[in-house]
Every structure is written in structure tokens, then in C-alpha cells.
Amino acid sequence: MNPVEDFTKLNLFGTFTNFVSAPVPFDCYHDPTKSETILVADLPGVLPNDMKVNVDKDKLIIQGKRECEKHDYLFSNRWCGSFIHHISFAKEVKASDVNVGLGEGILKITISNTPTNNVIGVKMSNNNKVEF
């Protein structure tokens, strides 16, 4: 069985684009050597205290905000404000198998492939570096 098939219900951009003016770059891939699925998003300017990642059965819910700077802009291409993103998986996700890191504007979520029936919140790690 191909582990990537577990993500057939994955909808990466639908919810993000409802809240921000431009799509947030978001990648998802499977690392077969570690049996992990990895999600990576570019979130420059988003701080760990402004992020929350929750697991709800077969869904990963990512929400956060980036403060809007008050300037007399001639134009602005950077997004600000709140966002929420729901990622659905083909199987249930166990919160203890989810590792979240945010550093240098990159959000990295690593998920081990272990099914569960629990609904548990996942807290952000406080490290400033994301290791790949």
C-alpha cells in the first residue's frame, strides 16, 4: 500500500484562501525511511504564540494570525490577519504522533502513521529552529 494514498481527501488551499489574500505555500510529503508524513508551510511573521494546531480524529486544524502593520502603503503584497486550515486524512491521527515546530517563518508538522480515536490538542514547540 502506498502511504501517500492516505491523503486522498487532502485539501490544502481551500480554507487558507478564504482568510488570506494570497495562497499560503504549503507542501505535504511522505518520508518512507521514517514512516512519517510531513507538512511544511511558509508563514513569515507568524509567532508561535499566535499559532494553534489541533488534532480532531482524522483532521488536523491549523489556525493562527499575523498582525497587520499600520502604514500608509502605496501597495502591499504581504498577507496579514487570521487564518484557519483544516487538513483531512484518510485515517485517524493520534495527537501524540504529531510534532509541530515553527521557526524562521517555516511551520513544520511531522505525523507518524499510527491510527487512534482520541481528540487531543497539540501545543507548539518553543524551539526557534526547524530541522529538516
Curated annotation (Swiss-Prot):
GO molecular-function terms, A-Z:
unfolded protein binding
Q: Does the keyword Ribosomal protein apply?
A: no
UniProt cross-references to InterPro entries, sorted A to Z: A-crystallin/Hsp20_dom (IPR002068), HSP20-like_chaperone (IPR008978)
Name the UniProt record assigns to this protein: Small heat shock protein hspL
The keyword tRNA-binding is annotated on this UniProt entry = no
Species of origin reads Dictyostelium discoideum (Social amoeba)
**Recorded family membership:** Belongs to the small heat shock protein (HSP20) family.
Its keywords, alphabetically, are: Stress response
Name a biological process GO annotation: protein complex oligomerization
- sHSP domain mapped to chain residues: 15-131
Q: Which Pfam families match?
A: HSP20
